[in-house]
Structures are given as structure tokens and as C-alpha cells.
């Protein structure tokens, strides 16, 4: 089993990290929030969970033990697969997850794309008493990045796009900023996301794009 990897970041695209370890490149699935912390050419260490399927082997990577444990606990919940678990961690860090479970706040999980009311309730029920944060992370760049991406997604939804389309565009915009080493602030992400959506723009989007360019 591969429990961790340490090496050089060759690329970060969307939710895929390519990490070179002793000449071998490993493709690792990460959250967009985690991807924003990684830079091309830098050294990085990720804790990993290997998910084995009949036709595939997929590595999921995390910045710390709390994220890894939260991911594995989520994957143990009925109806939650690895991709859905990663989506939850994009919206809620382990500390926020623990607080939501303790408060029986299933609404916090319903906000995650792909998590319905029934699954959200199961998460709260099945994770009760299991989530403990051992290394609280300071709410610095990663937390700020998550807030910014959520705000941009909300803005795009308000302009008429579906949550799925909006989130995909923002994730791609955030990944592009990370690859170029540029700050992922709200004006930049909104401008780039609108540019990616292009011809799909609903009424009112062009004005928002002009506002973002100012």
C-alpha cells in the first residue's frame, strides 16, 4: 500500500497532481483547494489513500492526517464514494466537518454537489463520535481560497448557470491560476471562469465579465 509520497510537483491540473518520486510520476487526485497550495517545481508531501476498483487503481492525496482520516471515514458512509468524499473535503475542512457532525447539521453536507438529503443525514449519523481534529490548520491561504471559490461559484449561479457548470468552470480557473503561480482572487477567478464559459453565457453575464475586468 502507498501511504505517502514525497517528490517534485510536475504539474497540477484541476484536481490531478502529477508528482515525481525518484523518477516515477504518480497521478494523485486532490481537492482544488489543496491544488492551490501546490506549485510547479516545488517539493511536496502528500498522505495518500489507494482506492482499488475492478478496473482501476486511484490515488487520493491529502495535506495532513486529519484530511486523510476524514476522507476514509466518508468513504465508509453508505452512498458516499471517493469522488463525493473529495467534494465534501473541498467544501468543509476536517474541523468544519467535525463541528457539523457534532451539531447534527446535515445542511452543511447538502450544500456539496452530489450529496442529497438522505446521504447528508447518513454522514451525520454514521460519523457521530468518529471525527476528531488532531492538527487544526490555521485558516490561512487554503481556507481563504476555499471561501473565494465558493463566492465565485455563487456569483455564477446567480448569473444563471447551474451549480455543476459553475463549479467546473471555477475549478478550472483555480487550477489555471495555480499552474501560472498567480493569486486566485475573486476578480481573477470570475474573469477567467466567465472566459471559459464563453458562448454559454446567459443574460447578464457579459456585464459581470466587464465588471470583473475593471
From Swiss-Prot:
<keyword id="KW-0234">DNA repair</keyword>
<dbReference type="InterPro" id="IPR000085">
    <property type="entry name" value="RuvA"/>
</dbReference>
<protein>
    <recommendedName>
        <fullName>Holliday junction branch migration complex subunit RuvA</fullName>
    </recommendedName>
</protein>
<dbReference type="InterPro" id="IPR036267">
    <property type="entry name" value="RuvA_C_sf"/>
</dbReference>
<feature type="region of interest" description="Domain III">
    <location>
        <begin position="144"/>
        <end position="214"/>
    </location>
</feature>
<dbReference type="GO" id="GO:0048476">
    <property type="term" value="C:Holliday junction resolvase complex"/>
</dbReference>
<feature type="region of interest" description="Domain I">
    <location>
        <begin position="1"/>
        <end position="63"/>
    </location>
</feature>
<dbReference type="Pfam" id="PF07499">
    <property type="entry name" value="RuvA_C"/>
</dbReference>
<dbReference type="InterPro" id="IPR010994">
    <property type="entry name" value="RuvA_2-like"/>
</dbReference>
<feature type="region of interest" description="Domain II">
    <location>
        <begin position="64"/>
        <end position="139"/>
    </location>
</feature>
<dbReference type="GO" id="GO:0009378">
    <property type="term" value="F:four-way junction helicase activity"/>
</dbReference>
<keyword id="KW-0233">DNA recombination</keyword>
<comment type="subunit">
    <text>Homotetramer. Forms an RuvA(8)-RuvB(12)-Holliday junction (HJ) complex. HJ DNA is sandwiched between 2 RuvA tetramers; dsDNA enters through RuvA and exits via RuvB. An RuvB hexamer assembles on each DNA strand where it exits the tetramer. Each RuvB hexamer is contacted by two RuvA subunits (via domain III) on 2 adjacent RuvB subunits; this complex drives branch migration. In the full resolvosome a probable DNA-RuvA(4)-RuvB(12)-RuvC(2) complex forms which resolves the HJ.</text>
</comment>
<dbReference type="GO" id="GO:0000400">
    <property type="term" value="F:four-way junction DNA binding"/>
</dbReference>
<dbReference type="Pfam" id="PF14520">
    <property type="entry name" value="HHH_5"/>
</dbReference>
<dbReference type="GO" id="GO:0005524">
    <property type="term" value="F:ATP binding"/>
</dbReference>
<dbReference type="InterPro" id="IPR011114">
    <property type="entry name" value="RuvA_C"/>
</dbReference>
<dbReference type="InterPro" id="IPR013849">
    <property type="entry name" value="DNA_helicase_Holl-junc_RuvA_I"/>
</dbReference>
<dbReference type="GO" id="GO:0006281">
    <property type="term" value="P:DNA repair"/>
</dbReference>
<dbReference type="InterPro" id="IPR012340">
    <property type="entry name" value="NA-bd_OB-fold"/>
</dbReference>
<keyword id="KW-0238">DNA-binding</keyword>
<feature type="region of interest" description="Flexible linker">
    <location>
        <begin position="139"/>
        <end position="143"/>
    </location>
</feature>
<comment type="similarity">
    <text>Belongs to the RuvA family.</text>
</comment>
<dbReference type="GO" id="GO:0005737">
    <property type="term" value="C:cytoplasm"/>
</dbReference>
<dbReference type="InterPro" id="IPR003583">
    <property type="entry name" value="Hlx-hairpin-Hlx_DNA-bd_motif"/>
</dbReference>
<comment type="function">
    <text>The RuvA-RuvB-RuvC complex processes Holliday junction (HJ) DNA during genetic recombination and DNA repair, while the RuvA-RuvB complex plays an important role in the rescue of blocked DNA replication forks via replication fork reversal (RFR). RuvA specifically binds to HJ cruciform DNA, conferring on it an open structure. The RuvB hexamer acts as an ATP-dependent pump, pulling dsDNA into and through the RuvAB complex. HJ branch migration allows RuvC to scan DNA until it finds its consensus sequence, where it cleaves and resolves the cruciform DNA.</text>
</comment>
<dbReference type="GO" id="GO:0006310">
    <property type="term" value="P:DNA recombination"/>
</dbReference>
<dbReference type="GO" id="GO:0009379">
    <property type="term" value="C:Holliday junction helicase complex"/>
</dbReference>
<keyword id="KW-0963">Cytoplasm</keyword>
<dbReference type="Pfam" id="PF01330">
    <property type="entry name" value="RuvA_N"/>
</dbReference>
<keyword id="KW-0227">DNA damage</keyword>
Amino acid at each position: 500500500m502507498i501511504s505517502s509520497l514525497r517528490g517534485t510537483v510536475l504539474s497540477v491540473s484541476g484536481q490531478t497532481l502529477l508528482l515525481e518520486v525518484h523518477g516515477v510520476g504518480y497521478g494523485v487526485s486532490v481537492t482544488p483547494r489543496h491544488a492551490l497550495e501546490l506549485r510547479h517545481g516545488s517539493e511536496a508531501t502528500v498522505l495518500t489513500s489507494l482506492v482499488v476498483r475492478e478496473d482501476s487503481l486511484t490515488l487520493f492525496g491529502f495535506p495532513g492526517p486529519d484530511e486523510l482520516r476524514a476522507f476514509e471515514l466518508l468513504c465508509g458512509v453508505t452512498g458516499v464514494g471517493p469522488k463525493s468524499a473529495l467534494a465534501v473535503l473541498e467544501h468543509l475542512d476536517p474541523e468544519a466537518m467535525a463541528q457539523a457532525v457534532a451539531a447534527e447539521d446535515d445542511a452543511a453536507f447538502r450544500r456539496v454537489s452530489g450529496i442529497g438529503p438522505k446521504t447528508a443525514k447518513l454522514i451525520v449519523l454514521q460519523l457521530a463520535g468518529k471525527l476528531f481534529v488532531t492538527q487544526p490548520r490555521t485558516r490561512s491561504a487554503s481556507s481563504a481560497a476555499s471561501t473565494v471559490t465558493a463566492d465565485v461559484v455563487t456569483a455564477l449561479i446567480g448569473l444563471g448557470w447551474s451549480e455543476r457548470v459553475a463549479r467546473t468552470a471555477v475549478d478550472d480557473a483555480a487550477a489555471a491560476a495555480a499552474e501560472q503561480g498567480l493569486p486566485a482572487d475573486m476578480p481573477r477567478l470570475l474573469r477567467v471562469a466567465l472566459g471559459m464559459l464563453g458562448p454559454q453565457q446567459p443574460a447578464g453575464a457579459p456585464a459581470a465579465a466587464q465588471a470583473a475586468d475593471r
